[in-house]
């Protein structure tokens, strides 16, 4: 009985061994002699192939990529340490071109590191200078040529062109006409008046009104880069539709800012009086539709304004102000030696009563013109809150 039990147990163990052998195992890939020879040649050239090379070899030999990886890894492991060090240095030089010897003393290593850092910082400065908008094409070519022939060991003896390039680039920002430099002091108040001289003042009434007019001032050669061009708004005059610019700042602020920005008061007075003269003459012409001819004072005032130089600065107008003032006084026969603001107070009441102009922020009562005198509120600036009754003086009497 026992003898029969042993063969049964042995058969059971044999079956277990056979089942273990039948399990799926990773078969070792065998290359042919030709493929092995080709792999050895590639391994001799580069023991650390990149992924593209390994993928190409896997497609060529019709095998997975991990088989190529294992073959190269096994061949590198079988090499002696000296050969493995040589192959590693070859691969390092191929990917990272290092021309220095790996065995250097401490002083040589510090000198090489300082020279490398200086060369890198100099090249970064070159690239930053070439990206500046003021550098011309010839300057960029000169910088590129100097960068190619640069020697890091003679950096201290060479004169770097960064100062020359920086001075040339900064000179572009400092260039300008002297009149533009003078006119730029008040360019923040009258924006864009070089091309659009007449939008500084407007009446307080509706822009759609037929009698809405704009004061005209002398042009300032202001810097265009400081302020954007004024936005255009539709302007209705009768049946025609024109386009005029919206006002950005009041010229009366010039008198307020004369101490901080050096603007002459006489220059402001000259431009303001010219605008008052022209506005009064335009009112006399517009309030009488039956007269289609321009008054003589209006044409004479325009001739006087054309005689003044349009591009003169505040200091030039200061010299010309006495002669211009005498001509202004002579152009008005009804002034009798009185200032312009006193003339505005003696405007006929029917003109102020029939005028449809309304000041901003105030309501005009019906019949107020019959009970009170002349109101200067219709002649005030937009946004300037001054007295509106006739008992008090005109709001711009202090500017005349």
Curated annotation (Swiss-Prot):
Annotated DNA-binding residue span(s): 24-83
Subcellular locations according to the entry: Nucleus
Stretch list, region Disordered: 1-29
One Pfam family this sequence matches: Homeodomain
Gene Ontology cellular component annotations, sorted alphabetically: nucleus
Superkingdom assignment: Eukaryota
Bias type Basic residues, positions: 19-29
Database matches in InterPro entries: Engrailed_Homeobox_TFs (IPR050720), HD (IPR001356), Homeodomain-like_sf (IPR009057)
Biased composition (Basic and acidic residues): 9-18
Keywords: DNA-binding, Homeobox, Nucleus
A GO term for molecular function: DNA-binding transcription factor activity, RNA polymerase II-specific
GO biological process, one term: regulation of transcription by RNA polymerase II
Record-linked SMART domains: HOX (SM00389)
Protein name: Cytoplasmic polyadenylated homeobox-like protein 2
Species whose genome carries this gene: Homo sapiens
């Amino acid at each position: 009985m026992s003898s029969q039990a042993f063969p049964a147990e042995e058969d059971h163990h044999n079956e277990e061994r056979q089942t273990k052998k039948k399990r799926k195992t990773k078969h070792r890939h065998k290359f042919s002699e030709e493929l092995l020879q080709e792999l050895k040649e590639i391994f001799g050239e580069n023991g650390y192939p990149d992924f593209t090379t390994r993928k190409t070899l896997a497609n060529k030999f019709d095998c997975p990529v991990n088989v190529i990886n294992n073959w190269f890894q096994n061949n590198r492991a079988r090499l002696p340490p000296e050969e493995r060090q040589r192959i590693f240095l070859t691969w390092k030089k191929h990917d990272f071109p290092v021309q220095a010897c790996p065995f250097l003393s401490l002083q040589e290593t510090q000198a090489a590191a300082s020279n490398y850092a200086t060369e890198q910082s100099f090249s970064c400065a070159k690239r930053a200078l070439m990206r500046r908008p003021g550098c011309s094409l010839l300057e960029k070519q000169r910088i590129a040529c100097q960068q190619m022939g640069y020697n890091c060991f003679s950096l201290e003896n060479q004169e770097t062109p960064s100062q020359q390039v920086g001075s040339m680039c900064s000179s572009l920002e400092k260039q300008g006409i002297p009149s533009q430099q003078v006119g730029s002091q008040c360019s923040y108040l009258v924006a864009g008046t070089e091309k659009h001289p007449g939008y500084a003042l407007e009446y307080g009434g509706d822009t759609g009104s037929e009698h809405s007019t704009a004061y005209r001032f002398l042009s300032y050669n202001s810097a265009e880069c400081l302020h954007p061009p004024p936005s255009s708004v539709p302007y209705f005059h009768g049946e025609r539709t024109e386009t005029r610019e919206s006002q950005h700042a009041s010229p009366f602020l010039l008198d307020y800012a004369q101490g901080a920005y050096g603007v002459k008061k006489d220059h402001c007075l000259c431009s303001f009086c010219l605008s008052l003269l022209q506005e009064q003459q335009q009112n006399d012409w517009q309030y009488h539709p039956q007269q289609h001819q321009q008054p003589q004072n209006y044409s004479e005032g325009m001739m006087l304004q054309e005689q003044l130089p349009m591009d003169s600065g505040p200091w030039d107008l200061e010299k010309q102000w006495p002669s211009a003032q005498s001509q202004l006084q002579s152009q008005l026969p009804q002034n009798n030696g009185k200032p312009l603001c006193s003339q505005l107070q003696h405007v006929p009441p029917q003109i102020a009563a029939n005028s449809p102009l309304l000041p901003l922020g105030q309501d005009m009562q019906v019949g107020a013109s019959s009970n009170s005198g002349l109101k200067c509120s219709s002649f005030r600036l937009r946004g300037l809150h001054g007295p509106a009754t006739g008992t008090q003086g005109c709001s711009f009497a202090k500017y005349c």
